[in-house]
Curated annotation (Swiss-Prot):
<keyword id="KW-0560">Oxidoreductase</keyword>
<dbReference type="GO" id="GO:0047545">
    <property type="term" value="F:2-hydroxyglutarate dehydrogenase activity"/>
</dbReference>
<dbReference type="Pfam" id="PF06039">
    <property type="entry name" value="Mqo"/>
</dbReference>
<comment type="pathway">
    <text>Carbohydrate metabolism; tricarboxylic acid cycle; oxaloacetate from (S)-malate (quinone route): step 1/1.</text>
</comment>
<protein>
    <recommendedName>
        <fullName>Probable malate:quinone oxidoreductase 2</fullName>
        <ecNumber>1.1.5.4</ecNumber>
    </recommendedName>
</protein>
<dbReference type="GO" id="GO:0008924">
    <property type="term" value="F:L-malate dehydrogenase (quinone) activity"/>
</dbReference>
<keyword id="KW-0274">FAD</keyword>
<keyword id="KW-0816">Tricarboxylic acid cycle</keyword>
<dbReference type="InterPro" id="IPR036188">
    <property type="entry name" value="FAD/NAD-bd_sf"/>
</dbReference>
<keyword id="KW-0285">Flavoprotein</keyword>
<dbReference type="GO" id="GO:0006099">
    <property type="term" value="P:tricarboxylic acid cycle"/>
</dbReference>
<dbReference type="InterPro" id="IPR006231">
    <property type="entry name" value="MQO"/>
</dbReference>
<comment type="similarity">
    <text>Belongs to the MQO family.</text>
</comment>
Amino acid sequence: MANKESKNVVIIGAGVLSTTFGSMIKELEPDWNIKLYERLDRPGIESSNERNNAGTGHAALCELNYTVQQPDGSIDIEKAKEINEQFEISKQFWGHLVKSGNISNPRDFINPLPHISFVRGKNNVKFLKNRYEAMRNFPMFDNIEYTEDIEEMRKWMPLMMTGRTGNEIMAASKIDEGTDVNYGELTRKMAKSIEKHPNADVQYNHEVINFNRRKDGIWEVKVKNRNSGDVETVLADYVFIGAGGGAIPLLQKTGIPESKHLGGFPISGQFLICTNPDVINEHDVKVYGKEPPGTPPMTVPHLDTRYIDGERTLLFGPFANIGPKFLRNGSNLDLFKSVKPYNITTLLASAVKNLPLIKYSIDQVLMTKEGCMNHLRTFYPEARDEDWQLYTAGKRVQVIKDTKEHGKGFIQFGTEVVNSKDHSVIALLGESPGASTSVSVALEVLEKNFAEYEKDWTPKLQKMIPSYGKSLIDDVKLMRATRKQTSKDLELNYYESK
């Protein structure tokens, strides 16, 4: 039986992952004391902000990097199933927050939007068709459509077909159940709900600057008020570091062994933003292409409709932009300060192993707006320079670590959970699809670090997430019932299986 004594939890950062974790903890243990510290003046300013990411509800409907071609030409869709299930889990939790009154007006943060995959060239068309055949035979994706007909593509994505002829070899697949998610608005809603909780204290313009672990295992957390300069020490049984790009430096300050042999490589995302309403109104889908050969998953180009502040907009990217800051609002010394005697060999090994990635990043940095526009024209041939502006979005810090399987300096893509041996310190590192799978990440944190509470928490988690403990991949009936319910809760369109 778990110790029912009230615990003190310090949460660092007010992005989507931290507010998701905080939202769960306040329902699982209402008597626990939650202190959430954000160094900026409001929640969701960094990578969670709607202007700092593409807002894709990552469900593996159109993202081709989740479906891998095997040597025999077949397509492995196992990762796509996993990503889709994780997004369905997120939708269940968001629906619960709406039904329980913790947040309101789901259309403020999630909107239905078809997801399309688009490719050109004989080999890519063959890949997409094989992917379609593999996915349409699996219940999660059985509403997928496929075409090589330009006239059908004109119906799906008219903007992208302007100026094209039927002579070009190309193909597209479409799933109508896709979404656009305003993670910034979702974060703000969850943060506001936490602020109202009687045992929560949310402080903005407060920065965690250091840690000290007492002999009794309690953490002393030093927090600086960025307005007054005052420093206070708060006590914590658990420290949750969800500070985005700032997580690695904070993890290093804890001094836990798990923070060693770990580093980060900061990369910004840049997007072309459309400023012409006539162009914006011609495109009402998310269209993902295929990453160029030999480049990492972050290079997948996409042309996205977005819903921001109740208005439609249009963006294309991403283009990488490297720099020393770990956060948009960070310091040019972030990268250099993160280099320690215990991780310098890890970072150097990574540089040697990942020369193609470094070359790609440098090429991207040197790319002008003209170069970005040329990339856009592979999607939208008639794009005009005057209709688009180049915008630098959020930071991602690629995790670099030593592993038994890959040796020194392995670059980890996706979201990584790091915790101390005694589970008192938990840090979330990495990037996409973090926001879309934030609920599954929070559940992983709970399962790995709060095992003694499993018996008490399982019924509560099943109330929040009805499929908790079950498989939406294996249980088709449950998957369909879950989708139908979350579509109702979140005011989304529901499509019966074909």
